[in-house]
């Protein structure tokens, strides 16, 4: 029915839910051109970045500049129209939020200031129809769990970070430390065990109930109970916010000389770091943000070849909320905000 409607006209009506002010969504009806690939979202996932907009925790000038805006940059959907010959109607696809406008020989598109990113100054996926270029989509195998596939974007960021780490790190990779017991830390530790099965992965966090879920980790410690003799070769910071200061400080103190520190967490405000020890130990610090198509392809291939990972990732799903109205979307964000652990999945039924 929707395909017939799309093919029968050069324009189509799209219904979007946009955040216009903190904690306030509005419905927007607009016309879009029928071109490239059009996807109907099926499962979306709320990210901490979405919450920072929803809760009004971004700087006031940032909110003024970027709102109104449709949120959400993690999601999967179904192809309903394609005039590029890249997909069949009905194909299940994961959507890539980064949208390059230029190419650079040396800089990855996810770091180019010219790139647009869904849900960050550019409408995200809370619409009944999404128009994308075919290279912003990756087809999913028929047997994939779509609720888990909804946050492939998050997994792809971690894959991207581990790939960049591999290019700069010294060969000594016997002991990894992961700081953070939330979604980011969970997936990072899981993938490190997958990519480096012979290495020891230690997770340091704040919440005992969260750390209990890291059954695949070799060791877990609460932040204030880390033994004095803990030594790691490389550290992954997955904390974010102001708390990342203490996490980075502990990584610097426990890491071996010439180790690498990978920063995943986002802090809205600058934090001090111990440059003296960084210099003394000859450490390398690398920041990670977003991902690109090759990272999505890697994740889809990884999940296809290692279906057991779905069982571990399923533990991350804490809430599943069906979205049929603006109030449903607000309720989902409110539930997600008070959730201590896990991902909130939106079943998009608009």
What are these regions (language model features)?
Residues 1-13:
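Single conserved hydrophobic/aromatic residue that forms the stacking wall/gate
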Residues 30-44, 59-102, 141-143:
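Glycine-rich beta-strand-centered segment in the early N-terminal region that forms part
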Residues 45, 83, 98, 239-243, ...:
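Short glycine-/small-residue-rich Rossmann-like dinucleotide-binding loops
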Residues 74-76, 91-92, 129, 181, ...:
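Residue-level marker of beta-strand positions
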Residues 99-175:
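NAD(P)H dinucleotide-binding glycine-rich loop of Rossmann-like/cofactor-binding domains
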Residues 167-174, 195-196, 211-284:
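Glycine-rich cofactor phosphate-binding loops and adjacent beta1-alpha1 units
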Residues 249, 293-350:
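C-terminal hydrophobic helical "lid"/dimerization subdomain
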């Amino acid at each position: 029915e929707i395909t017939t409607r799309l093919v029968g006209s050069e324009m189509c009506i799209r219904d979007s839910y946009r955040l216009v002010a903190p904690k306030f969504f509005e419905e927007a009806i607009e016309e879009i051109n029928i071109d490239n690939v059009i996807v109907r979202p099926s499962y979306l996932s709320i990210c901490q970045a979405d919450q920072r907009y929803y809760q009004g925790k971004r700087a006031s000038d940032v909110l003024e500049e970027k709102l109104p805006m449709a949120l959400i940059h993690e999601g999967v959907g179904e192809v309903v129209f394609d005039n590029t010959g890249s997909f069949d109607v009905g194909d299940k696809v994961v959507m890539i939020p980064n949208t390059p406008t230029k190419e650079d020989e040396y800089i990855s598109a996810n770091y180019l200031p010219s790139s647009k990113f869904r849900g960050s100054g550019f409408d995200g996926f809370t619409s009944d129809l999404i128009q994308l270029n075919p290279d912003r989509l990756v087809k999913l195998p028929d047997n994939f769990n779509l609720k888990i596939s909804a946050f492939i974007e998050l997994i792809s960021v971690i894959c991207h970070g581990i790939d960049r780490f591999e290019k700069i790190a010294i060969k000594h990779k016997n002991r990894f430390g992961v700081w953070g017991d939330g979604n980011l830390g969970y997936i990072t530790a899981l993938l490190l065990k997958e990519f480096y099965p012979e290495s020891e992965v230690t997770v340091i966090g704040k919440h005992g109930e969260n750390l209990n879920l890291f059954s695949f980790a070799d060791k877990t410690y609460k932040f204030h109970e880390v033994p004095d003799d803990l030594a790691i070769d490389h550290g992954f910071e997955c904390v974010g916010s102001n708390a990342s200061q203490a996490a980075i400080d502990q990584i610097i103190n426990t890491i071996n000389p010439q180790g690498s520190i990978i920063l995943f967490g986002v802090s809205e405000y600058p934090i001090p770091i111990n440059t003296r020890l960084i210099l003394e130990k000859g450490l390398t610090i690398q920041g990670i943000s977003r991902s690109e198509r090759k990272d999505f392809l890697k994740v889809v291939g990884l999940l296809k070849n290692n279906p057991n990972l779905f069982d571990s990732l399923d533990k991350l799903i804490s809430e599943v909320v069906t979205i049929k109205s603006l109030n449903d979307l607000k309720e989902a964000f409110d539930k997600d905000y008070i959730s201590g652990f896990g991902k909130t999945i939106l079943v998009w039924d608009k």
